Regions:
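Surface-exposed interaction regions that form or flank ligand-binding interfaces
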Residues: 43
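Small/polar loops that bind or transfer phosphate-bearing groups
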Residues: 6, 31, 59
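Local sequence-structure signature of Cys/Sec-based thiol-disulfide redox active-site neighborhoods
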Residues: 1-24
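A short, hydrophobic beta-strand/beta-hairpin element that forms part of a small beta-sheet core
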Residues: 47-56
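Short conserved loop adjoining the S-adenosyl-L-methionine
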Residues: 40
């Protein structure tokens, strides 16, 4: 299972996270938090959220440093 980015349209932090993942060459699956009731209840105030195997790696403001630290685990 790869990375999953839980995001929403119109979210500037989400757009920044998408750009950072793309710049780092990290492939991910996009899931719209507003399209799924479970995701909405769990993550609506936490987006963007990056998951790996169902585990939260990052949420909120993504930075290159935070992303590098989390991906090296």
């Amino acid at each position: 299972m790869g990375y999953v980015l839980i995001s929403r349209k119109g979210c500037h932090l989400c757009e920044e996270a998408e750009a950072l993942l793309a710049a780092q060459g990290i492939a991910y699956t996009f899931q719209d938090v507003d399209a799924d009731e479970h995701l909405k209840k769990t993550y609506t105030f936490r987006v963007p959220v990056l998951l790996k195997e169902g585990r939260v790696l990052l949420e909120g403001k993504f930075t290159p440093e935070r992303l590098s630290r989390k991906l090296s685990l």
